[in-house]
Every structure is written in C-alpha cells, then in structure tokens.
C-alpha cells in the first residue's frame, strides 16, 4: 500500500510540474489544506522567526490551528460585507506594533467567492510588507 501511495504521489508531482513548468520536487501533496498550511507556516517560522499571520476574523478553527501550532500568532482582520474576505482598506489602516512582524497573510475565498480586485490588492499589500501570501 505504501509503495502504491508513493508511486501515486510521484506521478502526481510529475503531472503538476509538467502543467505548471515547475519541478516535481516543488510539490508537496497533502491530504487536507490545513496540513499544507501547517507545512507553510512551519517553514515561515523556521526562516523568519516569531511573528504574526494576518487572517480574517470570519473563519474556522481549522484555518487558525496551523498558525498557532507553528508558533506564530494569528492577527485578525475585519472582513468586507460584500466579499466576506479580508477588508483590504481596513488592513491598510490597521495599527501594527513597532516590533510586530507580519510574516504571512491568509487569503480565504469564503464560500468559494473570489473578489479579484480585493485579491490583487491583498497580494500587493503582502508584497509591500514582505509577507508570504497563503491562498
């Protein structure tokens, strides 16, 4: 069974790499998104140290647990009533402590709704802050 699973993951990595022009070694298939988030946040903390992850207030514990388990701090942002996602305007004016370092931002598409303008703005803000965008 383990050999079959390993072979399946190898084939999946090859297919994903082929479709995206990347390397198979770049892909880390996981069973659930929260497991992938855990891998990402562990890596962020190992490279950047202590800090926070900006996430939206309207979410579930399975989206916050990987942040906490990795040793980072969740920093909650207000959501927009029209998108149910992070309200970028409020994040832009959110006061940060002088020693607070935002290492990542979570872009959650609540109910599968994607607001392209807000997504672009949040991605740009993450870049300006030097934060990893986790979508």
Ranges and model annotations:
Residues 29-32, 55, 104-108:
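A short beta-strand submotif of the Rossmann-like class I SAM-dependent methyltransferase core
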Residues 36-38, 61-64, 115-119:
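Short, well-ordered alpha-helical microsegments
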Residues 83-135:
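Active-site phosphate-binding strand-loop segment of PLP-dependent enzymes
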Residues 10-52, 66-68, 76:
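Phosphate-binding glycine-rich loop
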Residues 19-20, 70, 98, 129:
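Residues at alpha-helix termini
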Residues 40-100:
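Conserved PLP-anchoring active-site segment centered on the Schiff-base-forming lysine
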Residues 1-7:
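N-terminal "arm"/small-domain region of PLP-dependent enzymes with the aminotransferase-like
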